[in-house]
Amino acid sequence: ERWDSLRLLTPNWLSRLPSYGYEGDDPHGFRTMPETIAFLERYAEVISAPVLTGTTVTSVRRVLDGYEVLTDRGTWQCQAVVIATGACNIPNVPAVAEALPRGIDTETPKDYRNPDQLEEGGELVVGASASGAQIAEEIHRSGRPVTLAVGEHIRVPRVYRGRDIKWCMDAAGVLDDPYDEVDNIVRVRNVPSLQLVGSDDRRNLDLNRLTDIGVRLVGRLV
């Protein structure tokens, strides 16, 4: 459920799981989605994890000796629960999309795969965080005129003083900040993802670059 060219925003070396990490020869590269899936599958094999796919969790509650997890395949007892569903599993489609003329097709990042699936003509990309910026760049390079609706976004360099920005964040402890020590948790949870792209040339991807290659920037859609 991701576009074909998507790569992780984090370098390979930053893929760290308990007693398991990156084992390849390109630690500063960026994994594709098939490579990411293979990495997780290999980890499951190494630790003999009883992976259950297609399972719906209906509730989680604390009990005396840990947690009780109710699912559509039974009840589990465990000492710890990791919620890693991500923030983008359900597309956030603005209500104004329902008022668009029938002749205008709409796609969400969940359904978008590559520019070949799009109709001929110009494209409006709504949102300019990591996903929106990457998709806008890709569609523009396919030869279509692209307009990008921009809100509040965070611009960072891919490389700072010779180091990947994720290395800087990791070294500074930013990635380890506990949620209960954040000044404004509501704002933090709503801060858009960094404008980054994982690429072999480690290039920057921000509004300036998009403007330079010909992407038209406008304000918020709603």
Each predicted region: which residue ranges?
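Generic domain-boundary/flexible-linker signal
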Residues: R62, N92-V93, P157
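Sequence-level motif detector for i,i+2 pairs with an aromatic at +2
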Residues: N12, L64, R102-I104, D212
